[in-house]
Regions:
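Terminal, non-catalytic protein-protein interaction segments that mediate quaternary/complex assembly
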Residues: 1-289
Length: 289
């Protein structure tokens, strides 16, 4: 995909060397953005082999709302480095996507949803939580029938909670995304505080593009664009040679995604099929923990 290769080249040409917590220095840039037209195909990278099944298991783990990887690690090991022996994570994206904590004590002048809100439930421990994904789906559907919500601009999902993020071992990197409708096309914009261009960004691109396709199908929209802003877009120094190799490879035709005719919350791993995917060989990159 040309947009990805353009990003790699830009960071290699313009990045500034930075030290970081991992012990492996990076070359970094500020606020890199790109767009992909999802109507032209599924943007799974072809200039190296991508492990689609691992990404798909990760996406369904997010959508499960689980705060641990006990089930995920049976399918893929991509989160093992950040979990404890029992599979617990200090931060889990899906936990906030589907179960964002709702305060029951408000500051003066503030209001919060309660159990009368259709997207709020109470956990076994008594905590009120908000299902942001269901809110997005219900709002997008209502926009088709309710003139007061026809051009909604409040379809935002947040995985960042300051009280958690300031003490977590690895707070969310891709921490917020928003949906937007133009005509009958559903668009998604992802904001990421930190992006590992060799390893993380290809997965993020594939994951959120697929999520956009799934929600568009559920809500009766055509797929539009996926836009991505990475605040600290960086390349680890031990990834440079592999990425230079990737730059020499010509992108191949984009693949397609087939989604089963089921409701969004009934979809499983087997209901998402990758079609016509061809790629160049694997390029191995070490994970910086």
């Amino acid at each position: 995909m040309k947009q990805y290769l353009d990003m790699v080249k830009y960071v290699l040409d313009n990045g500034i060397k930075k030290e970081n917590r991992t012990g492996v220095d990076t070359i970094s840039t500020f606020a890199y953005s790109y767009k992909v037209d999802l109507s032209k195909g599924y943007p799974l990278l072809t200039t190296k082999k991508m492990y689609f099944n691992s990404m798909l298991h990760e996406l369904f783990w997010y959508l499960s709302g689980e705060e641990h990887i006990k089930n995920l690690r049976k399918k893929t090991k991509i989160w093992d480095a950040w979990a404890d022996e029992e599979g617990r994570l200090e931060t889990a994206y899906g936990r906030f996507w589907r179960r964002y904590p709702v305060p029951e004590i408000s500051l003066d002048g503030e209001v919060f949803a309660d159990e009368n809100n259709p997207w709020v439930t109470r956990e076994k421990n008594g905590q009120l939580v908000f299902d942001q994904i269901q809110y997005i789906i219900d709002t997008l559907k209502e926009m088709k029938t309710n003139p007061n919500h026809k051009n909604g601009r409040r379809m935002i999902v947040l995985a960042w909670n300051p009280g958690n993020a300031t003490i977590s071992k690895l707070p969310p990197c891709h921490y917020t995304f928003a949906f937007n409708v133009l005509g009958n096309k559903l668009n998604c914009h992802l904001t990421q505080r930190s992006g590992d261009i060799a390893l993380g960004i290809p997965f993020n691109l594939a994951c959120y593009s697929l999520l956009t396709m799934m929600i568009a199908k559920e809500c009766g929209y055509e797929v539009g664009e996926f836009a991505h802003t990475i605040i600290d877009a960086h390349i680890y120094e031990n990834h440079i040679e592999g990425l230079k190799e990737q730059l020499t490879r010509e992108p191949l035709k984009l693949s397609k995604i087939r989604i089963a005719d089921k409701s969004f919350n009934e979809l499983t791993f087997e209901d998402i099929v990758l079609e016509d995917y061809e790629s160049h060989p694997v390029i191995k990159f070490e994970v910086a923990v």
